[in-house]
Amino acid sequence: MSLDSNPRIFTVSRLNSEVRLLLENEMGIVWLVGEVSNLTMPVSGHWYLTLKDSQAQVKCAMFKGNNRRVTFKPQNGKQVLVKARLSLYEPRGDYQLIIESMQAEGDGRLQQEFDHLKMSLAAEGLFAQTAKKALPEQPKCVGIITSKTGAALFDILNVLKRRDPNLPVIIYPTLVQGTNAAIQIAQAIGRANSRNECDILIVGRGGGSLEDLWCFNEEIVARTIAASQIPIVSAVGHEIDVTIADFVADVRAPTPSAAAELVSRDLSSQLQIVSHQKRRLRSAIERYLSQQQKRLSTYQFRIEKQHPQLQLNTQSQRLDDLNQRLENHIQQRLERNQHKIENLSLRLSNLSPARKVHQDKQRIETLKRRLLDSMDRNLLMQRHQLALAAEKLDTVSPLATLKRGYSITRNASGSLITSTQQVHTGDTITTRFVDGEVQSTVDK
């Protein structure tokens, strides 16, 4: 068996890193349909899930920056269409998808139709701000085009009754969902214009899925709204729901209730004007951002290939794993420390601090007495030793020797004379006795 003389040897981490780069660079973006399962949404804001079909499954991650743009709440068991890129979670060697966008299955075809019609109508100028009609500051009559049994109608009527109970209201009932809904909505708008009973119209309905709201994305509705001589406020679904009707209408309200607030008179008329301008500005920004989204997406993919955010996302996913392990470890430590505290508390309760204080006081008193006794004994001993030293000193003192009859003789220079060899005839010497001195001259 022959072996390569120079085999390329990998570490596990290096191998996983190169496999990740291979997947991300070679495969690029993929579109995938599957069923959501094992969905988790940790505090980091990222989503982790599994997409599966009847024969296979794949792990997926959708980071916070992307999932905040999802317009619905994903649930286990729900079919979704995702745009993703292949990757590898290096710490575990798990092959996974990094999801960049997500929508409910079936929304993809409708979204394409939506984008195509929106671009077509925008090119014709139907969305232009110059085509918008100003809303009357004090409407004399409000027309409502919606379902006569829907919750949206009752929400609008309740708000109008609360804010301006004397404002006349005319209802033009119509279907707001289904095959014939778009035609009926267009006919209701035409009927309101031909009767010319109102000076403002609210067109809308409550929230729903993309399919539920689709009649407001039909071209016939958009063109009828654009052709209306009466200013129209669109109020379709919730704030996150955006339809073609919203772009064509003179003003978009986020909800039916908000539309009623917008068209009804209020004592604070100046605040109403400011609020209206804010809504128009937001609508213009939304249109602009929507028009630029496709243009940005091409550049976004190129940038993201080398963007540090990719590494940050991987590290963030790893951090989620470490956070989970840390939480488990902290919980175990807390339990052990709690057990120790309970044991220490029990031991502490069996010890009396007062008893220990009393014992320490007694010990201090004993040590104090012993210290004083030791000081007294030491002082007495030092005095005795001092007396003995004084006696010894007195014994060797020259004065004591002189008292016994001895004398001390010195020459003229003061040097001590201890021998006759040290004096000569004629020298002057000084002799000291115990009671004084005598000077003498040496004769011989």
From Swiss-Prot:
List, in alphabetical order, the GO biological process terms annotated in this UniProt record: DNA catabolic process
Primary place of residence?
A: cytoplasm
The entry's cellular-component GO terms read:
cytoplasm; exodeoxyribonuclease VII complex
Does Repeat appear among the keywords? Answer: no
Q: Which InterPro entries match?
A: Exonuc_VII_L, Exonuc_VII_lsu_C, OB-fold_nuc-bd_dom
**What Enzyme Commission number(s) does the record list for this chain?**
3.1.11.6
Q: Which reaction does it catalyse?
A: Exonucleolytic cleavage in either 5'- to 3'- or 3'- to 5'-direction to yield nucleoside 5'-phosphates
Q: Which family does it belong to?
A: Belongs to the XseA family.
HAMAP family from the entry?
A: Exonuc_7_L
What protein does this entry describe? Exodeoxyribonuclease 7 large subunit
What organism, scientifically named, is this protein from?
Aliivibrio salmonicida (strain LFI1238)
